[in-house]
């Protein structure tokens, strides 16, 4: 018995042979007779992954999230502009701290002057005349005494720069202020003002001195107990 061909429209036609050189196969032709089979979608080029979604409105991609190990910068210290007067360091406490801070410098320079006076040399000249005999002596510092006095003076100056510049600018307190438990901070940030600004603050005390030292008395009546140098540098003294 001979086989009869299938009636038209029952089966889709066989797919065409693959194209040369590994090209993509063309989509199959539509089945005859409207059998209802839809052609498969064409394969995407490249790796076969779907394309990325379009960017959000405006055409800009959202910023990347922060790194897992990153730390946000710490907030600035609290401003202390509104503290009551009693919260600032009293004037007498600041005076006592100044005596403590300057004591090592005075001791070093004083030792240098004592050594220079003790080691000075004297030279005498005798004058003989017909009616009188006189002797004149002149004292002058020795080279060793002058050298020791100079070295101790430089050491005292280095101590002041370290104490009032580096130490006070870094932690807020010089030696005297640490003993009496208070510190110098910026009234806008509440933090120590740093080495350079601390040195400038000490130089600004010259203004307190040239007006007959009245600038040093300002903390007696000022609401924030500031000297003129404090007002210029926007610093205040507060207890630790």
Curated annotation (Swiss-Prot):
Residues 1-78 are annotated as: Disordered. The chain crosses the membrane at residues 98-118, 142-162, 203-223. The keyword Disulfide bond does not apply. It is found in: Cell membrane. GO terms for cellular component: extracellular region; peptidoglycan-based cell wall; plasma membrane. Was identified as a high-confidence drug target. This is Proline-rich antigen homolog. It comes from Mycobacterium tuberculosis (strain ATCC 25618 / H37Rv).
